[in-house]
């Protein structure tokens, strides 16, 4: 049976911390619905019971950014692949925060930055739903993929920024803001 909450409860936060993967769904008023899996360790943070954020590394598209800039609606979903079975959905409003934005430093300090980070998605929680999850398989994590961070580590920083500057439209033609700097990863 589904239960609804106004904010994240402590048991929700504990469940989120155990998840190796989460899913992000966004849509603008018109066009495609985007659904993306995310799963690099340490990229999702619960900032408060009504605020979460996650690191976004440059990839093949930037649909989430375009949709949040146009509409703001976002749903995040986690599935407990261990016992007990549980699905948790976070409904909210999100926005992209790029390294050039004034709030970047404070938000980025909450994460260990990975090579190729282009933005952080900052989400205000408007509601939380849990459901049984009895249809979700029981699985164990073998390991996290390191391909994306390794790919970004191997890039020339100037060429990387130039490539990002050319990616300012979603699949449906919605505008995005490109990051203006290459982040190599954690600083000493």
Q: What residue ranges belong to the model's regions?
A:
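Binding-site signature for planar aromatic cofactors or substrates
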Residues: 1-188
